[in-house]
Regions:
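Bacterial N-terminal signal peptides that target proteins for export
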Residues: 1-9
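N-terminal mature ectodomain segment of secretory-pathway/periplasmic proteins
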Residues: 26-105, 137-144
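Gly/Pro-enriched, hydrophobic low-complexity segments
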Residues: 86, 149-244
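Bacterial N-terminal signal peptides
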Residues: 8-17
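Sec/Tat signal peptide C-region and signal peptidase I cleavage site
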Residues: 18-22
């Protein structure tokens, strides 16, 4: 009798373990692509312009900044933050990254460090880290589920071509991203930031998060991004992503 009980419990445990590991990383990625609108619709978006408000939250209180982000396939990105007539710019054209930092008293464009350039390049793709990850030089592992604010989210480890690592959490019912944890090297020290996604809305048939809350583990402060307007496949000049060339240099 004892042998039968042990056998039954063993079979139950085996069934539970099999169910927990039945899904693969590639299956989850396919479900995520379908949930967002489908791989074809995602690939059809060649440019994306997002506008909204970015709130910085810290010991100083909070400050709202006008925000705009431009992305162009395959991997160009430019973000702008504007307040009191001054605009902070960060851009990546697929080869090099640069910035304009008027709030630090630097109004001329300057090239970004290698670590900062990698971080910007990691987020440049319109389709995100999961879609066509092999073509992007990444590796992905499925790590099971993890509790995210009461939700048993699917956890994927993304080893990026840059050497940085991201952990992406997918909602178990809708398979959309609800959180990412990015681990990156900054001047020889590992930096970790968390982004929580919500308020998904369609742009040209593809779902994008219109609310992104970020938290930096190293005490860099929190941000809340709210997208108010989105446009896809509008013409974007390559020059807006490239390092500006002064008139005297032409």
């Amino acid at each position: 009798m004892r042998t039968k009980v042990v056998l039954v419990f063993g079979m139950v445990a085996l069934a539970a373990a099999t169910a927990a590991h039945a899904i693969t990383a590639d299956e989850l990625i396919a479900k995520n692509a379908a949930a967002r609108g489908g791989a074809d619709k995602i690939a059809a978006i060649k440019s994306l312009k997002l506008e909204g408000k970015l709130r910085f939250i810290g010991g100083f209180g909070s400050i709202d900044v006008g925000y705009a982000q431009y992305q162009k396939a395959p991997d160009s990105v430019r973000s702008e933050g504007t307040v009191q007539g001054l605009t902070q710019v960060q851009a990546w054209d697929g080869k090099e990254a640069w910035q304009i930092s008027p709030f630090q008293g630097r109004k001329d464009p300057e090239r970004m460090s290698a670590d900062d350039a990698k971080a910007l390049a990691d987020d440049a793709s319109i389709s995100g880290a999961l879609i066509d990850y092999k073509a992007k030089g990444s590796k992905i592992e499925y790590l099971g589920t993890e509790d995210i604010d009461g939700t048993q989210a699917h956890k994927l480890k993304v080893s990026l071509k840059s050497g940085n690592t991201e952990y992406i959490y997918l909602d178990p019912d809708h398979f959309l991203e609800i959180r990412t944890v990015a681990q990156r090297m900054v001047r020889g020290t590992e930096s970790e930031s968390t982004a929580d996604f919500g308020d998904y809305e369609q742009v040209n048939g593809v779902y994008f998060p219109f609310s992104v809350a970020t938290h930096s583990k190293d005490g860099g402060g929190d941000t809340q991004l709210t997208i108010e307007k989105a446009q896809a496949n509008e013409p974007l000049d390559d020059a807006m992503f490239a390092f500006p060339v002064s008139k005297s240099a032409k």
